[in-house]
């Protein structure tokens, strides 16, 4: 997989860095678990633009990755798109402090520093484009002052092959060690990377 360097969003659209290579080459997604999930999604495409929800077999996803996996239902209410958790791995609900299954995203994520709007914008963009996406952001809340980094893949699923009705997502949360210079000092939210994953690029 290669990378389309098109980016969008409402929160600090200037990326911290651009990653030059693709998933199949091992260069874009900076976490092996998320890369494995992307490879699985591509295999399940079977030559189509995106897999169906029924094509995703939990047994086929390695056990080490499953705690990082979420499945979200895309709910269309007229022109509005909402996202409801249908499955959330333990890593996610432990980070959020509650099990979110069955709840809408706005009932779970904090609105602090525009974080809820940021995540909704990522899922909305990916849903409308019908293309897999990788993103990274730094976030602090409640005056903590020490940022958490989130690495995220958002992968579209569609029962009719055209309209995205489900999202297969993977999240990895990283917490800095004391004086870890890899984590910038930020106040609130900062996006580092947002790129489409080009699944048609050669290996």
Describe each model-derived feature in a short phrase.
Residues 1-108, 120-203:
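Intrinsically disordered, low-complexity terminal regulatory regions
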Residues 113-116:
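Helix-loop-helix
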């Amino acid at each position: 997989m290669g990378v389309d360097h098109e980016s969008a969003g409402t929160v600090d659209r200037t990326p911290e860095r651009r990653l030059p290579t693709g998933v199949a080459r091992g260069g874009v997604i900076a976490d092996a678990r998320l890369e494995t999930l992307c490879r699985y999604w591509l295999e399940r495409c079977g030559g189509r633009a995106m897999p169906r929800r029924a094509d995703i077999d939990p047994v086929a996803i390695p056990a080490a990755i499953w705690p990082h996996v979420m499945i979200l239902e895309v709910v269309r209410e007229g022109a509005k798109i909402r996202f409801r958790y249908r499955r959330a791995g333990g890593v996610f609900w432990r980070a959020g402090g509650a099990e979110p299954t069955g709840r809408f995203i706005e009932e779970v994520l904090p609105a602090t520093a525009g974080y809820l709007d940021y995540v909704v914008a990522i899922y909305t963009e990916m849903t409308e484009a019908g293309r897999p996406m990788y993103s990274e952001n730094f976030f602090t809340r409640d005056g903590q002052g020490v940022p958490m980094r989130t690495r995220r893949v958002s992968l579209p699923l569609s029962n009719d092959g055209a309209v995205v009705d489900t999202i297969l997502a993977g999240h990895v949360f990283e917490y800095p060690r004391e004086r870890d210079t890899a984590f910038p000092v930020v106040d609130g939210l900062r996006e580092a990377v947002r790129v489409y994953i080009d699944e048609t690029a050669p290996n």
